[in-house]
Swiss-Prot record:
Zn(2+) binds at C38, C41, C56, C59. The keyword Repressor does not apply. PANTHER family: 60S RIBOSOMAL PROTEIN L37A (PTHR48129), LARGE RIBOSOMAL SUBUNIT PROTEIN EL43 (PTHR48129:SF1). Binds to the 23S rRNA. It comes from Archaeoglobus fulgidus (strain ATCC 49558 / DSM 4304 / JCM 9628 / NBRC 100126 / VC-16). This is Large ribosomal subunit protein eL43. A zinc finger (C4-type) spans 38-59. The gene is rpl37ae.
Amino acid sequence: MGRTKKVRSAGRFGPRYGLRVRRTWLEIEAVQRQKYVCKKCGKKAVKRSGTGIWECRHCGYKFAGGCYQPVTPGGKIVEKSVG
């Protein structure tokens, strides 16, 4: 239990990889595992089902997005310039 206080779920790696890498992984994992708002139905039910694949648990809408987030910062810029 003592090894997960600073790095929470990244504590499963134990002392391996160093503290900085485990903290970085913790931030990435928090973004990856949270729920996002669906573009189609508007519910906060979008979860990651695979690498770059996102699925709404409410309406079943499945789409491709970023690896860790459904919409990447670069994708937002492209949407602004196109749309």
